[in-house]
Curated annotation (Swiss-Prot):
Principal subcellular localisation of the protein: cytoplasm
Catalyses which reaction(s): tRNA(Ala) + L-alanine + ATP = L-alanyl-tRNA(Ala) + AMP + diphosphate
Listed Pfam families: DHHA1, tRNA-synt_2c, tRNA_SAD
The enzyme's E.C. designation: 6.1.1.7
Gene it is expressed from: alaS
NCBIfam families hit by this protein: alaS (TIGR00344)
Binding locations of Zn(2+): H567, H571, C669, H673
Species: Rickettsia conorii (strain ATCC VR-613 / Malish 7)
Cofactor comment text: Binds 1 zinc ion per subunit.
Name of the protein described by the UniProt record: Alanine--tRNA ligase
PROSITE patterns in the cross-refs: AA_TRNA_LIGASE_II_ALA
Recorded domain comment: Consists of three domains; the N-terminal catalytic domain, the editing domain and the C-terminal C-Ala domain. The editing domain removes incorrectly charged amino acids, while the C-Ala domain, along with tRNA(Ala), serves as a bridge to cooperatively bring together the editing and aminoacylation centers thus stimulating deacylation of misacylated tRNAs.
Amino acid sequence: MTKFTTEEVRSKFITYFKANNHTHVPASSLIPHNDPSLMFVNSGMVQFKNVFTGQGKRPYNKAVTSQKSLRAGGKHNDLENVGYTARHHTFFEMLGNFSFGDYFKEQAIYYAWNLLTKEFELPKDKLYATIYHTDDEAAAYWKKIAGFGDDRIIKIKTNDNFWSMGDTGPCGPCSEIFYDHGEQIYGGLPGTKDEDGDRFIEIWNMVFMQYEQIDKDTSIELSQKSIDTGMGLERMTAVLQHVNNNYDIDLFQEIINFTENIVKVKVEGEAKFSYRVIADHLRASSFLIADGVIPSNEGRGYVLRRIMRRSMRHAHMLGSKEPLMYKLLPKLVDLMGNVYPELKRAESFISSILEQEEIRFKATLERGLKLLTEETETLTKGNELSGEVAFKLYDTYGFPLDLTEDILKNRDIAVDHKGFEEQMLMQKARARKSWLGSGESKTDQLWFDIKEQHGSTEFLGYTLNEAKCKIIALIKNNNLVNDIKEIDTQFLLISNQTPFYGESGGQIGDIGTIFAKDSEVEVIDTLKYLGSIIIHKCILKKGQINVGENANFSIDIRYRQNLRIHHSATHILHAVLHEVLGKHVTQKGSLVAPTYLRFDISHSKAVTNEEITLIEDKVNEIIRDNHEVTTTLMATEDAIKQGAMALFGEKYDSEVRVVKMGETSLELCGGTHVRRTGDIGCFKITSESAIAAGVRRIEAVCGEFVITLMREKDSLLKSIESSFKTNKNELITKVNNILERNKEVEKELEKTLLASLDLSIEQIEKQSAQITGIKLLYKKVGNIDNKILRQAAENLTKKVEDLIMVYIAEGIGKLSITVAVSKAITDKYNADIIAKKLSLFLGGSGGGGQASLAQAGGNDIGKLTNIHEKLYSLLTVS
């Protein structure tokens, strides 16, 4: 049997099916574009789901893919097993061939058998097939094509061999192909009590979609039958490389050996599992970031953070003191970047995110591990860590629950899940209590009913500013009504068509006026719901408005033009950001308002002043070039092939609107735009800031609002000149002189304050209290800077060898604690411990410092009356 590399297995699979007239379809993003039920793409069929359900069409009826997939959240959560078993992964590649109404069972079985035995040269006597127990047709084909006897065809009665998309929809029996690793490995055939062993391994699964489930008890035969198959690349490569563990294949071994050369720990014993975790999680993290996911505390971003932090903990176990994951990225790009070019394009961005996340987590990892050690040192095998401690590790130290479980697994200590969830619910309740909601109570069902009865609203606003439209629904207080009579009443209005743009794609909705026979309605906002219902938020100004009557809808043209200007500017900005900051930049959000624009991007560091200037210059150059702005309707796939930018996670129809601005920008967009880039006038960035880890926000203004901004700045400058009694040419010099003078005054004030806090040895002796052979001196002071208190306390403890000095400074609603201990007695009394305990007593959360000097905070000013007793009890216990 020939030994194949991972790359050769992937290539041969795709080449084989291409030779058999299958279209090679590139892998989709790990983020499902059209399936809100999935967090991540977890199989090859996901990108074809709408084809299988009959809701979409492709220009081909046979396809082959190598699909990047991820299972680390929801139903398919393999995270805790990854690294410890032979075949569990978070990220993996699924090879698959698909038929949409073309070939069916016989041809699918033939393709699989021919590829395995002739192309991959697997011994026929090593292969077995499973079928659904009633699928006699598949059994007959296995006998005909492979020559199998009944002993090699295993009938399975469970749903393991019957696939369905849900309670209703396409479904059908499966046939799986198993490979026998040999009797030297423990395990039994599928369906036996030993089936969970590693001897017989599933290498290919074929789903024969031949039925449609109508309801719980009824299914019918499909007129168009389809095939969905899946072969795990890593599993198949292990078979072809004669190894029984996926982590022993060439791709993983390259990453593991590269890691070993950096950390200098042998790949053996417990370390072996850590190397495997790191290799797997490096792939998952890198591909997720390349597909636009950023570490966060919710949704996909939190799954990514869990994966990253688990790998970082294993790097810590290998003794890595510095960030490690980003150093491994070049090896991964070298191994997989040619097949998945998004890795190469986003390499610098991925590297930056990996490094930053590891630096951030390392700051709390050791403290969290220390707490976990302290809390579990009395626990033995079979005991349980309290949910309260697990939640503290999560909330304070950033330990995902499964990371805590992973750490305790080897000691056979469980975690109190119920207690953890109770703590989580309490936190959410506190958050809800502090949040003032909108109070809206309308139900989704109302909008579904309207859409079902009347269909989508036709948008006329690309070409018309006003139009005659029919009013089909009026909603007041979440209820459908036939008319609106009360002047100044707020209500919602839906029409069969409208020139008003409903807020979507970042562009806010239009405003304007609706005139009926004897009525006038002010439109104060326009929304879009269920993707295609346009809702006018209205106030009745005159007369009465009725369902069924025709009215003249007229948008505010100036308002719309300013929206067009700022929306078109975001497209140009997006293109320029790619050029200036790098191809890794992806849009994470936007707001197009009539007076400004906001654009959120994936970028791991602040945009420099030089970069901002360059971005502004390039955007304004494109504006001055006055490129024509054109819009075209085309198939989504054609638009993507032409290089049109699409947003991750955005749902697109089969036909999309493509907006082109010269040769500068090409994007999928349903918004409204200027006719030529010159209509924008000019562009000016007003702010740049961080809004989350790895996400930056740029705000800017265009056109007349740039002039307004310049006038405001000019007015401000003149006011400052007047206040400083100087002109703009001398302003900087004057301000610098004042700042220098302020520094001198601050130094003088600092000296004065230090002098006022200083005490002689005699004064210390007189004012301090004697406790257990040492001197305690406590002073309550005003809102004095911590730096001064630190210096004053340190000065006093240097004068006397057995002094504990405590300052508590009272500010507005807060307390500042400073504790200093003479170095001669730090073996008995620790300033850091004293400060932390005082902080907790005074309503703080602890502080930090050294044995001789520490500072902390508090906020319970009322407890100061008992501070002497607390200090005495602390020191007598110490």
